[in-house]
Structure formats: C-alpha cells, structure tokens
Amino acid sequence: MAPGLDLIWMVISFLLLIHLSSQQETGFSFNGFRQGDLHVDGVAQILPGGLLRLTDTSEQKKGHAFFRQPLVFNSSEPLSFSTHFVCAMVRKPGVTGGNGIAFFLSPSMDLTNADATQYLGLFNTTTNRSPSSHIFAIELDTVQSAEFDDIDNNHVGIDVNSLTSVESAPASYFSDKKGLNKSISLLSGDSIQVWVDFDGTVLNVSLAPLGIRKPSQSLISRSMNLSEVIQDRMFVGFSAATGQLANNHYILGWSFSRSKASLQSLDISKLPQVPHPKMKTSLLLILLLIVLGIILLVLLVGAYLYRRNKYAEVREEWEKEYGPHRYSYKSLYKATKGFHKDGFLGKGGFGEVYKGTLPQEDIAVKRFSHHGERGMKQFVAEIASMGCLDHRNLVPLFGYCRRKGEFLLVSKYMPNGSLDQFLFHNREPSLTWSKRLGILKGIASALKYLHTEATQVVLHRDIKASNVMLDTDFTGKLGDFGMARFHDHGANPTTTGAVGTVGYMGPELTSMGASTKTDVYAFGALILEVTCGRRPVEPNLPIEKQLLVKWVCDCWKRKDLISARDPKLSGELIPQIEMVLKLGLLCTNLVPESRPDMVKVVQYLDRQVSLPDFSPDSPGIGIVTPVLVGGSSTVISNISSPVTEFITHSIQYGIGR
C-alpha cells in the first residue's frame, strides 16, 4: 500500500477510535424513541409517537429492545455504568396483569431461544441458572413465582444468570419529603422512574413516580463483583414477556452512561404519553348501571332485614288465644323511643323498666331475658289472667310481648314510682302517717281481692315496698307479679321452692310451700317497714336491731312500742300507730295458722273489729327462724349472724323466678 494511503487509513482509524471512545464515555439519552438507535425483536415496536412498546396484550409473547452499538468494557478501566429510564405497565381491562420488565446486559442480541411467561424473555429452562449465560438484569416483576422464590407479585430484583434474584425488595421509593418509604404499584399504569448505578463495587437501584427527584436513599444497595458476568463486549436493553395474562409494557425514555457523573438527565416534558385502553362508553354505562343496581338491591335487602330483625318477635300457635294481651314489639319500641335512657325508670332482679307513651296513655315497659321454652304457655296464660284482674289497688297489667330471648311486660305508668323511694331515699314529699296508713289499707284490700275475690286464688309471693307503686294521689298499688301463682279456690297450691326477699319470707315456705298465709307474713313485714321507716333486715345495725320483727317485739316487751315508729312520725296518732305495729307482729307470727287472713287484716285496719288479745310473749310473736332450702337441714343463714340471706331465682316459667 502506498505511503499516502497508509497515512490516510491511520487518520481514519484514529478518528473512528476517538468517536467510539467518546460514545462509550458519554453514552446516550432518548426522550422518546423517534430517532432512537434501537434494535427491536419479537412483538416489540416503536410506536409513531416515539413510545417503545415491548409487548402488547397478546398472550405468550416476548419483546426485546437493544441499543444497537455494543458496550466495550476494557479490563484496564473500572467496570461501571449508570442508567435512568421511565417505564409503564398498563393492564388490559378486566385482566389482573401479566409478567414484568427487565433492564439487562447480554453478550448477544439473539435471545430467540428464551421463553416468555415467567422467564421474562431472558432465559429458558436450560439457560436459567447457567453461568455461561452472562446475563445481568434488574427485574420489575409483577408475578410471584415459587419457582424463583419471588417475595411477592410487586417487587424489584437483581438477577445474575438466573431469575432467582440475588436480592429483591417490594417496589417502593424513599420520600425525602416525608422521610419514609412509600409503596409503588408496578401494575398501576402510571409512569415509573428507575435508576441503576454500578461503580464497580456497589450496585444501587432506586424507584420513584414520574415528576419526583431521584431519592436520596436507594431501594436496593448491594456490594457486587460483576467481572465474571460482564464480558468485554455487551449489549444493553430491555426485555418483557406475557403469559396467560398479558399487559402492555412501555419504555418512555432512556438515558445510559458508563459514568454516573456524565449520565444525562431525561427531559420529562418531552416524553411520549402512555395510552390507556378505554372501555366503550356503552359497555361502561351498562357495567355502571349493573353495579349501582346491585348496590341498591343490597341496601334494600339490608334495610329490610335490619327492620325485620329490629322488630322481630316470637309467636307460636298456642298464643293466639291471648292475642288481645299481646303488643307488637314495634309499638313498644316506638313508645319508649327505642328504650332510650331518658325514659329509664329503674332496674331490678326482673330487668329494666322504661317509661313509654302510647296514643291512649303512658305505660311502663319491663324487659328481661329468658332462656328455654319450659312453662312458657303457663307463664303467658298467667299474664293474660292478670290482665283480667280488676282492682283499684293493683297496678294494671295490660299485656306482654315476646321476642327470642326476651320478654316485655306492659303495665300502667305510676308517676310517683315505688314506695321505697319515699321511705329510704328521702324523696319528697315526706309521707305523713295518714298517707302511710292509706297505702297499707290499699295494699291490704288488693291482697284480700287476690286471695278471696278473684276468679282464682292469686299468691303474689313478692310483697315488699319496692313493689308497691304510687299514683299521683299516693294511692298504693301492688305490682310486679313475676312470682305470682294461681290456683282454684279450695285447691291446695303446688308451688315449690323458697322464692322472695329476705325479711318478707314466711319461715314455712320451704317445708309447706307458698300459701295465702305466706303473703300475710310478707304484708306484716311491709306494715312494720312502712310504720318504722326501716327495712325488714338491716345487717349493718347492731345485732339486736338487725331483724325488724324481733326489734319491734323487744320494744313492746320494754313497754316502749311507740319508740319503734319512724322518727318522722313524731306527734302523730300514737294509739293508731301502736295498733298497726301490733298488727304487723300478728301477721308475722311464726305459726301460719295464728296469722289472720286478709279479710281480717282489712277489718283491723279499718277499725271495724279490734285486734285479738295477745302480748309480745305470746307463742310465735317476734320470733324469726332461718329458712330451710328444700326441707333439708341446710340453713340459708350465717350462724354468727341472725340475718337470713336473700334467696332469688330467675323466672323459670312455672317454677318461680
């Protein structure tokens, strides 16, 4: 070759080397790919707007895009590179999404033997995990493959000759503004920025939404030696694949450099727009109407079920004969304003009591729970029978309502509440002797009616001050028939079990059962309670004063019976008060046969006849004995104290409460 030609060839070769060196040093930057020097294969293509689409929504497909010129890694120079790209994964409507995208370096642009699906178009079953592959990749994976030990279906991973990542992390970015990591959904369809920096020893990977600066903290930072993976001549590019589920994989822009310092920034404003598939308007409208219809139907069914359950009741065939005495739960719920606390009147062993208002009058609604069906028919029959009782000194019981697990009893509302509120809770006005005597006469008249004048004999079995209600005129009315039992006149009652309240219970209850004389005993205790202003049992007082019956008798023995009266009654009619105290002792005689019946009691209170001649030392007067349970020797009493304990039963529909 002529010397002149040699010189020309040397100059051309030198200039070419300078060009290649400059190209390798400075790298490239594409804000869209209209003029991008890319090689694409598979289903990958550059769209007219400059958007690189690696895959469309076809199934079982793969697509690659390479920078045409290979990267030359000189062993004498540090093995380093940096890249910044923007990608987006857009799902097909109604599809959960396909596989992901990988940024990678490969010794060849020929990946025709690579598989789609979970292999991301980089490997196949043979080349995966093969050191001879010499493929380094950063995967943005949206499918969790157990085969590759993926951590989840939305992660970033570092892959070296295998899709089993050497390190991975859930897709997220560090928010410098808030100082914490925020998750990113790779399949959201939004554009995502990715930075990959390798300085020869440490690999850093960062993510961020479009429009946010590169985070100060990397998502993944790992010390790595890539000298055995990256060969002298490598191609750089992107790969994506679809399986049975498919979506569009897009690259909007890409900047690459062998040096982090010389990496050019992408111009976000020049990036192409990502198309999002739109449903047809008619189909969207139809689906919207269907969804709205389903929501409306669910709301209507829910409202119906709520309303039905809210007012649901339990009704059985045998209850038809008691229909006039039954209230609907809905009417009681509305009458009490949903059992609002403002109408709460009190709470006792039977349950809670609320004031209610019906169109005709005010009512009191007592609600309490029940379990089981034993004796239910008898219980409701007795409620209906009590609704037929008619006496001015009985609280009128209007009827009932029955729900699953709950009873409601409806009675007339008593404005002044119960007698015990005035005796023991300083409720005003203070009860004068004339009012107290009038209350006792009224209750005595009511018991006389129950025992002798009603269609059946009615045993109340729970006479006490808290069950005596007062109307606006302080007329006493006996209420709370939850323990009441009925039997025909002349028949022997068959009640069993000692039920009631300590101090009001006749000592013969457990051995002989309830009778009219046990009601008389309880009324005698009530007489002493009203006259003395003390409860029948006061365990906190000195032992000689704890039992009211015994203490009143002791006062009489000391010839100071009047000292037992309520101190609030000083100056009242002493002879009349003493007579009433003696009547209380007579009614609480230990021997049932020695107690008067209620006919006599009414006559004594009305002073139609005089009390029989007896003294505090007469048999059975002022004597209190413990109550035996079931006729056994088990005494419901503490031996060191004369105070008998309270015995109570919940309602068991026919066997007591």
UniProtKB/Swiss-Prot annotation:
The chain crosses the membrane at residues 283-303. Its EC number is 2.7.11.1. One of its GO terms (biological process) is defense response to fungus. The keyword Transferase applies. The active site is at residue 462. It comes from the Eukaryota. Coiled coil: none annotated. It is a single-pass type I membrane protein. CDD domains: lectin_legume_LecRK_Arcelin_ConA (cd06899). Residues 1-23 form the signal peptide. Residues 339-611 form the Protein kinase domain. Residues 25-257 are annotated as: Legume-lectin like. Residues 304-657 are cytoplasmic. In the C-terminal section; belongs to the protein kinase superfamily. Ser/Thr protein kinase family. It catalyses: L-seryl-[protein] + ATP = O-phospho-L-seryl-[protein] + ADP + H(+); L-threonyl-[protein] + ATP = O-phospho-L-threonyl-[protein] + ADP + H(+). Keywords: ATP-binding, Cell membrane, Glycoprotein, Kinase, Lectin, Membrane, Nucleotide-binding, Plant defense, Receptor, Serine/threonine-protein kinase, Signal, Transferase, Transmembrane, Transmembrane helix. Disruption phenotype: Increased susceptibility to the fungus Alternaria brassicicola. Gene3D superfamilies: 2.60.120.200, Phosphorylase Kinase, domain 1 (3.30.200.20), Transferase(Phosphotransferase) domain 1 (1.10.510.10). Glycans are attached at residues 74, 124, 181, 204, 225. This is L-type lectin-domain containing receptor kinase I.8.
